[in-house]
């Protein structure tokens, strides 16, 4: 492999209950290929899979489960093998927390510690901490999550592992037709069926909001201008707060009856309004469906 095909690998390990699930979700939001609970003995095979992916797996986060002493022999061997492969850039992220915090988290979730399934969680924590001493010493980054909320842990991981491009907050604005269903991935849905409908003007019926005649018609009404003023004010207010909460993207869906005229016009307008400040993708889900409103 060449330097251009370097693979960035993060091995996530640490104390059970310290936040591995949140960490993996954070890496997934950053575009990493994530695998949870990968047994260390499978790491060499996984490395071969990455090498054969031809650049498709250039960022990988692995949640490694270390609940038995025999696992460490496989792990140390795999890590030594990684150090000899110049095309892999490995990092070990160790998540830790105070014993009292871990006990509280287990009580709150009503789960048993994996190393003390029938006993007190504190005993399992003691055993696990002893097992992971060498692993913690070998880690590139140790994060104490004792005083971190899930959102704060995500923010730390984004700060530590993302590039400037990956930190960009993405906004997807899409049009749709209610007759075909509301998009299941929409975060915000706006209904513009109250606006005058170009569909009932015969020569506009086969056109869409991408045509200037249709967009000019929809935008000429006073109610359209008032709605767009309120909509852009609302979205402009909300986006920084969504970003601060740790969301990597927001899907805004604007719907009319058939998804051809009004929603398309307003989606195009909103997308152009937001593009100077955000990374915006505009799409029209139902614009090709010519079945009428």
From Swiss-Prot:
Keywords: ATP-binding, GTP-binding, Nucleotide-binding. GO terms for molecular function: ATP binding; GTP binding. GTP binds at residues 65-68. ATP binds at residues 14-21. Coiled coil: none annotated. It holds the Pfam family PapZ_C. The keyword GTP-binding applies. SUPFAM superfamilies: P-loop containing nucleoside triphosphate hydrolases. Displays ATPase and GTPase activities. Belongs to the RapZ-like family. HAMAP family: RapZ_like (MF_00636). This is Nucleotide-binding protein BA_5384/GBAA_5384/BAS5004.
